[in-house]
Amino acid sequence: MRSFRAVRNFSTTAKRLSQAPKASTPNASSGNGFVLAFVAAAAGAGAYYYYANSPAAKVETFNATKADYQKVYDAIADKLIEDDDYDDGSYGPVLLRLAWHSSGTYNKSDNKFGSSGGTMRFKPEASHAANNGLVNARNFLKPIHEKFPWISTGDLYTLGGVTAVQELGGPIIPWKRGRVDEPESASPPDGSLPDASQGATHVRNVFNRQGFNDQEMVALIGAHALGRCHKQNSGFEGPWTFSPTMFTNDFYKLLLDDKWQWKKWDGNPQYEDVKTKSLMMLPTDMALATDKNFKKWATAYAKDQDLFFKDFSAAFSKMLNNGVDFPQGTEIWEFKPKNA
Protein backbone atom coordinates (compact mmCIF):
# COMPACT_ATOMS: atom_id res chain seq x y z
CA MET A 1 0.00 0.00 0.00
CA ARG A 2 1.45 3.32 -1.04
CA SER A 3 2.17 5.79 1.72
CA PHE A 4 1.55 9.44 1.06
CA ARG A 5 3.47 12.60 1.69
CA ALA A 6 1.72 15.43 3.50
CA VAL A 7 1.31 17.49 0.37
CA ARG A 8 -2.25 18.73 0.80
CA ASN A 9 -1.48 22.43 0.77
CA PHE A 10 1.71 22.14 2.80
CA SER A 11 1.62 25.83 3.66
CA THR A 12 -1.80 25.30 5.21
CA THR A 13 -0.53 22.24 7.05
CA ALA A 14 2.41 24.20 8.40
CA LYS A 15 0.05 26.83 9.74
CA ARG A 16 -1.97 24.11 11.48
CA LEU A 17 1.19 22.67 12.98
CA SER A 18 1.82 25.92 14.80
CA GLN A 19 -1.50 25.33 16.56
CA ALA A 20 -0.54 21.86 17.78
CA PRO A 21 0.14 21.27 21.50
CA LYS A 22 3.61 20.25 22.58
CA ALA A 23 4.38 16.55 22.51
CA SER A 24 5.51 16.69 26.13
CA THR A 25 1.94 17.38 27.28
CA PRO A 26 -0.17 14.57 25.79
CA ASN A 27 -2.99 15.10 28.27
CA ALA A 28 -3.28 18.85 27.88
CA SER A 29 -6.89 19.96 27.73
CA SER A 30 -9.03 22.91 26.87
CA GLY A 31 -12.06 23.98 28.86
CA ASN A 32 -14.00 20.91 27.78
CA GLY A 33 -11.28 18.56 29.01
CA PHE A 34 -10.50 16.88 25.72
CA VAL A 35 -7.75 18.44 23.68
CA LEU A 36 -5.13 15.80 22.97
CA ALA A 37 -1.50 16.51 22.29
CA PHE A 38 -1.67 15.36 18.72
CA VAL A 39 -3.08 16.97 15.64
CA ALA A 40 -3.78 14.23 13.15
CA ALA A 41 -4.06 14.22 9.39
CA ALA A 42 -4.93 11.33 7.16
CA ALA A 43 -4.79 11.08 3.39
CA GLY A 44 -4.10 8.53 0.72
CA ALA A 45 -3.02 5.30 2.37
CA GLY A 46 -1.48 6.66 5.57
CA ALA A 47 -2.12 8.70 8.68
CA TYR A 48 0.18 11.36 10.06
CA TYR A 49 0.49 12.88 13.47
CA TYR A 50 2.78 15.73 14.25
CA TYR A 51 3.79 18.02 17.03
CA ALA A 52 5.29 21.45 17.46
CA ASN A 53 7.88 22.50 20.03
CA SER A 54 8.67 25.61 18.03
CA PRO A 55 7.46 27.34 14.88
CA ALA A 56 9.63 24.86 12.97
CA ALA A 57 7.40 21.85 13.50
CA LYS A 58 8.51 18.28 13.15
CA VAL A 59 6.47 15.70 11.28
CA GLU A 60 6.21 12.07 12.30
CA THR A 61 4.89 9.52 9.84
CA PHE A 62 2.65 6.56 10.61
CA ASN A 63 1.51 4.55 7.63
CA ALA A 64 -1.89 3.45 8.89
CA THR A 65 -3.67 0.67 7.02
CA LYS A 66 -7.24 -0.52 7.17
CA ALA A 67 -6.06 -3.10 9.71
CA ASP A 68 -4.86 -0.28 11.97
CA TYR A 69 -8.25 1.43 11.80
CA GLN A 70 -9.94 -1.91 12.48
CA LYS A 71 -7.90 -2.04 15.70
CA VAL A 72 -9.30 1.36 16.68
CA TYR A 73 -12.81 0.12 15.88
CA ASP A 74 -12.22 -3.02 17.95
CA ALA A 75 -10.88 -1.02 20.89
CA ILE A 76 -14.01 1.14 20.90
CA ALA A 77 -16.23 -1.94 20.61
CA ASP A 78 -14.41 -3.68 23.46
CA LYS A 79 -14.73 -0.62 25.68
CA LEU A 80 -18.46 -0.48 24.96
CA ILE A 81 -18.74 -3.94 26.49
CA GLU A 82 -16.35 -3.35 29.37
CA ASP A 83 -17.60 0.11 30.37
CA ASP A 84 -21.35 -0.26 30.86
CA ASP A 85 -21.81 2.28 33.65
CA TYR A 86 -23.94 4.68 31.61
CA ASP A 87 -27.51 5.09 30.35
CA ASP A 88 -29.25 1.73 30.03
CA GLY A 89 -25.83 0.02 30.19
CA SER A 90 -24.18 1.44 27.06
CA TYR A 91 -22.20 4.45 25.88
CA GLY A 92 -23.16 3.52 22.31
CA PRO A 93 -26.04 5.99 21.94
CA VAL A 94 -23.99 8.97 23.14
CA LEU A 95 -21.15 7.99 20.77
CA LEU A 96 -23.66 8.05 17.91
CA ARG A 97 -24.86 11.46 19.08
CA LEU A 98 -21.28 12.76 19.16
CA ALA A 99 -20.66 11.64 15.57
CA TRP A 100 -24.03 13.00 14.44
CA HIS A 101 -23.59 16.40 16.10
CA SER A 102 -19.97 16.72 14.98
CA SER A 103 -21.07 16.18 11.38
CA GLY A 104 -24.46 17.92 11.36
CA THR A 105 -22.99 21.43 11.31
CA TYR A 106 -22.13 21.18 7.61
CA ASN A 107 -23.25 23.99 5.29
CA LYS A 108 -23.39 23.05 1.61
CA SER A 109 -23.53 26.71 0.49
CA ASP A 110 -19.86 27.23 1.33
CA ASN A 111 -18.80 23.61 1.96
CA LYS A 112 -17.74 24.48 5.50
CA PHE A 113 -17.90 22.77 8.88
CA GLY A 114 -18.99 19.18 9.44
CA SER A 115 -16.79 16.48 10.95
CA SER A 116 -13.51 17.30 9.26
CA GLY A 117 -11.91 19.66 11.77
CA GLY A 118 -12.65 17.71 14.94
CA THR A 119 -13.55 21.02 16.56
CA MET A 120 -15.96 19.49 19.08
CA ARG A 121 -12.84 18.99 21.21
CA PHE A 122 -12.74 22.75 21.81
CA LYS A 123 -14.87 24.69 24.26
CA PRO A 124 -16.76 26.90 21.76
CA GLU A 125 -18.46 24.03 19.93
CA ALA A 126 -18.59 21.72 22.94
CA SER A 127 -20.46 24.40 24.91
CA HIS A 128 -23.26 24.82 22.36
CA ALA A 129 -26.53 23.98 24.10
CA ALA A 130 -27.29 21.24 21.58
CA ASN A 131 -24.06 19.49 22.61
CA ASN A 132 -24.72 19.36 26.34
CA GLY A 133 -23.80 15.94 27.72
CA LEU A 134 -21.42 15.01 24.90
CA VAL A 135 -18.50 15.37 27.30
CA ASN A 136 -19.42 11.81 28.31
CA ALA A 137 -18.70 10.57 24.79
CA ARG A 138 -15.50 12.59 24.47
CA ASN A 139 -14.22 11.28 27.79
CA PHE A 140 -15.11 7.73 26.76
CA LEU A 141 -12.95 8.10 23.65
CA LYS A 142 -10.04 9.84 25.38
CA PRO A 143 -8.16 6.63 26.33
CA ILE A 144 -8.73 5.30 22.82
CA HIS A 145 -7.06 8.41 21.41
CA GLU A 146 -4.16 8.03 23.83
CA LYS A 147 -3.69 4.45 22.66
CA PHE A 148 -3.91 5.41 18.97
CA PRO A 149 -2.54 8.99 18.84
CA TRP A 150 -2.11 8.91 15.07
CA ILE A 151 -5.85 9.05 14.36
CA SER A 152 -7.35 12.51 13.95
CA THR A 153 -10.07 13.65 16.31
CA GLY A 154 -12.54 13.96 13.44
CA ASP A 155 -11.82 10.42 12.31
CA LEU A 156 -12.08 9.12 15.88
CA TYR A 157 -15.42 10.80 16.59
CA THR A 158 -17.00 9.57 13.36
CA LEU A 159 -15.56 6.07 13.72
CA GLY A 160 -17.01 6.01 17.23
CA GLY A 161 -20.46 6.61 15.76
CA VAL A 162 -19.95 3.89 13.16
CA THR A 163 -18.89 1.47 15.90
CA ALA A 164 -21.90 2.32 18.04
CA VAL A 165 -24.43 1.71 15.27
CA GLN A 166 -22.87 -1.57 14.18
CA GLU A 167 -22.24 -2.98 17.67
CA LEU A 168 -25.79 -2.20 18.78
CA GLY A 169 -27.26 -4.23 15.96
CA GLY A 170 -27.52 -1.65 13.20
CA PRO A 171 -26.33 -1.70 9.60
CA ILE A 172 -22.78 -1.60 8.31
CA ILE A 173 -21.75 2.04 7.79
CA PRO A 174 -19.25 2.75 4.96
CA TRP A 175 -16.52 5.05 6.31
CA LYS A 176 -13.58 7.02 4.95
CA ARG A 177 -10.50 8.23 6.79
CA GLY A 178 -8.84 11.55 6.11
CA ARG A 179 -10.28 14.22 8.40
CA VAL A 180 -7.70 16.84 9.34
CA ASP A 181 -7.95 18.45 12.77
CA GLU A 182 -8.36 22.21 12.65
CA PRO A 183 -7.67 24.91 15.27
CA GLU A 184 -10.35 26.31 17.55
CA SER A 185 -10.97 29.21 15.17
CA ALA A 186 -12.51 26.75 12.69
CA SER A 187 -15.39 25.90 15.07
CA PRO A 188 -18.89 26.22 13.57
CA PRO A 189 -21.36 28.84 14.80
CA ASP A 190 -23.97 27.94 17.37
CA GLY A 191 -27.43 27.11 16.05
CA SER A 192 -26.33 24.77 13.27
CA LEU A 193 -28.09 21.70 14.69
CA PRO A 194 -31.83 20.99 14.78
CA ASP A 195 -33.98 22.64 17.44
CA ALA A 196 -36.06 19.76 18.80
CA SER A 197 -38.95 22.07 19.73
CA GLN A 198 -39.66 22.96 16.09
CA GLY A 199 -41.70 21.38 13.29
CA ALA A 200 -41.41 20.17 9.71
CA THR A 201 -40.33 23.48 8.15
CA HIS A 202 -37.41 23.79 10.54
CA VAL A 203 -36.40 20.16 9.98
CA ARG A 204 -36.30 20.71 6.21
CA ASN A 205 -34.35 23.95 6.53
CA VAL A 206 -31.65 22.41 8.71
CA PHE A 207 -31.24 19.25 6.66
CA ASN A 208 -31.53 21.01 3.29
CA ARG A 209 -28.62 23.21 4.40
CA GLN A 210 -26.59 20.01 4.66
CA GLY A 211 -27.73 18.71 1.27
CA PHE A 212 -30.28 16.11 2.38
CA ASN A 213 -33.66 15.33 0.82
CA ASP A 214 -36.83 14.31 2.67
CA GLN A 215 -36.08 10.60 2.52
CA GLU A 216 -32.59 11.09 3.95
CA MET A 217 -33.92 13.38 6.69
CA VAL A 218 -36.43 10.80 7.88
CA ALA A 219 -33.80 8.06 7.80
CA LEU A 220 -31.31 10.12 9.81
CA ILE A 221 -33.85 11.01 12.49
CA GLY A 222 -34.25 7.25 12.90
CA ALA A 223 -31.05 7.48 14.95
CA HIS A 224 -33.49 8.15 17.79
CA ALA A 225 -33.88 4.39 17.92
CA LEU A 226 -30.94 4.67 20.31
CA GLY A 227 -30.59 6.54 23.57
CA ARG A 228 -32.66 8.91 25.64
CA CYS A 229 -32.97 12.59 26.46
CA HIS A 230 -31.92 14.13 29.77
CA LYS A 231 -33.69 17.14 31.21
CA GLN A 232 -30.48 18.58 32.60
CA ASN A 233 -28.93 18.57 29.12
CA SER A 234 -31.73 19.36 26.69
CA GLY A 235 -34.84 20.13 28.71
CA PHE A 236 -36.41 16.89 27.43
CA GLU A 237 -36.55 13.57 29.26
CA GLY A 238 -36.89 9.88 28.43
CA PRO A 239 -36.22 7.25 25.76
CA TRP A 240 -37.93 6.96 22.39
CA THR A 241 -38.22 3.17 22.49
CA PHE A 242 -38.35 0.31 24.97
CA SER A 243 -34.94 -0.92 23.76
CA PRO A 244 -32.72 2.20 23.70
CA THR A 245 -29.51 0.22 23.25
CA MET A 246 -30.70 -1.75 20.22
CA PHE A 247 -30.69 -0.22 16.74
CA THR A 248 -34.05 -1.15 15.21
CA ASN A 249 -36.96 0.45 13.34
CA ASP A 250 -39.04 0.56 16.54
CA PHE A 251 -38.83 4.35 16.58
CA TYR A 252 -41.03 4.55 13.47
CA LYS A 253 -43.39 1.81 14.62
CA LEU A 254 -44.03 3.49 17.95
CA LEU A 255 -44.31 6.94 16.39
CA LEU A 256 -47.01 5.84 13.96
CA ASP A 257 -48.80 3.04 15.83
CA ASP A 258 -48.99 4.36 19.40
CA LYS A 259 -51.14 7.20 20.65
CA TRP A 260 -49.29 10.28 21.88
CA GLN A 261 -50.24 13.24 24.04
CA TRP A 262 -48.53 16.33 25.38
CA LYS A 263 -46.66 15.58 28.59
CA LYS A 264 -47.73 17.62 31.61
CA TRP A 265 -44.53 18.52 33.39
CA ASP A 266 -42.09 21.37 34.07
CA GLY A 267 -39.71 20.63 31.19
CA ASN A 268 -39.77 21.52 27.51
CA PRO A 269 -42.93 20.61 25.57
CA GLN A 270 -42.70 16.97 24.49
CA TYR A 271 -45.00 14.05 23.79
CA GLU A 272 -45.53 10.95 25.92
CA ASP A 273 -47.16 7.68 24.93
CA VAL A 274 -50.70 7.41 26.26
CA LYS A 275 -50.41 3.75 27.24
CA THR A 276 -47.34 3.67 29.49
CA LYS A 277 -46.30 7.32 29.78
CA SER A 278 -42.71 6.06 29.78
CA LEU A 279 -41.71 6.93 26.22
CA MET A 280 -41.23 10.32 24.62
CA MET A 281 -41.26 11.98 21.22
CA LEU A 282 -39.91 15.41 20.37
CA PRO A 283 -41.90 17.93 18.33
CA THR A 284 -39.40 17.36 15.49
CA ASP A 285 -40.11 13.63 15.71
CA MET A 286 -43.84 14.19 15.52
CA ALA A 287 -43.28 16.13 12.29
CA LEU A 288 -42.50 12.78 10.67
CA ALA A 289 -46.05 11.66 11.45
CA THR A 290 -47.84 14.86 10.46
CA ASP A 291 -46.02 16.03 7.33
CA LYS A 292 -47.33 14.14 4.30
CA ASN A 293 -44.01 13.46 2.59
CA PHE A 294 -42.13 12.74 5.80
CA LYS A 295 -44.86 10.30 6.86
CA LYS A 296 -44.54 8.41 3.58
CA TRP A 297 -40.96 7.51 4.45
CA ALA A 298 -41.62 6.94 8.14
CA THR A 299 -44.35 4.47 7.18
CA ALA A 300 -42.02 2.69 4.77
CA TYR A 301 -39.36 2.32 7.47
CA ALA A 302 -41.89 1.15 10.05
CA LYS A 303 -42.90 -1.65 7.68
CA ASP A 304 -39.44 -2.62 6.46
CA GLN A 305 -36.43 -2.58 8.79
CA ASP A 306 -34.09 -3.72 6.02
CA LEU A 307 -35.07 -0.69 3.96
CA PHE A 308 -34.48 1.58 6.94
CA PHE A 309 -31.06 0.04 7.57
CA LYS A 310 -30.08 0.48 3.92
CA ASP A 311 -31.21 4.10 3.75
CA PHE A 312 -29.81 5.04 7.16
CA SER A 313 -26.44 3.56 6.25
CA ALA A 314 -26.24 5.64 3.07
CA ALA A 315 -27.49 8.87 4.68
CA PHE A 316 -25.32 8.58 7.79
CA SER A 317 -22.22 7.82 5.75
CA LYS A 318 -22.98 10.91 3.66
CA MET A 319 -23.42 12.99 6.80
CA LEU A 320 -20.07 11.84 8.20
CA ASN A 321 -18.32 12.73 4.94
CA ASN A 322 -19.94 16.11 4.29
CA GLY A 323 -17.40 18.91 4.14
CA VAL A 324 -14.34 16.65 4.27
CA ASP A 325 -11.67 17.28 1.64
CA PHE A 326 -10.71 13.66 1.12
CA PRO A 327 -7.56 13.10 -0.96
CA GLN A 328 -8.25 11.68 -4.40
CA GLY A 329 -8.45 7.91 -4.31
CA THR A 330 -9.37 7.63 -0.62
CA GLU A 331 -10.92 4.21 -0.15
CA ILE A 332 -14.33 3.52 1.36
CA TRP A 333 -13.98 1.00 4.16
CA GLU A 334 -16.38 -1.24 6.02
CA PHE A 335 -15.38 -2.61 9.41
CA LYS A 336 -16.23 -6.03 10.73
CA PRO A 337 -18.41 -5.83 13.85
CA LYS A 338 -17.13 -7.54 16.97
CA ASN A 339 -20.61 -8.92 17.56
CA ALA A 340 -20.81 -10.55 14.11
From Swiss-Prot:
GO molecular function: cytochrome-c peroxidase activity; heme binding; metal ion binding; peroxidase activity
Primary localisation category: mitochondrion
Reaction(s) the record says it catalyses: 2 Fe(II)-[cytochrome c] + H2O2 + 2 H(+) = 2 Fe(III)-[cytochrome c] + 2 H2O
Single Gene Ontology BP annotation: cellular response to oxidative stress
Domain of life: Eukaryota
UniProt remark on cofactor binding: Binds 1 heme b (iron(II)-protoporphyrin IX) group per subunit.
Residues at the catalytic site: H101 (proton acceptor), W240 (tryptophan radical intermediate)
Cofactor: heme b
Places the protein is found: Mitochondrion matrix; Mitochondrion intermembrane space
First and last residues of the transit peptide: 1-17
Quaternary assembly: Forms a one-to-one complex with cytochrome c.
Primary role: Destroys radicals which are normally produced within the cells and which are toxic to biological systems.
Record-given protein name: Cytochrome c peroxidase, mitochondrial
Lineage, broadest ranks: Eukaryota, Fungi, Dikarya, Ascomycota, Saccharomycotina
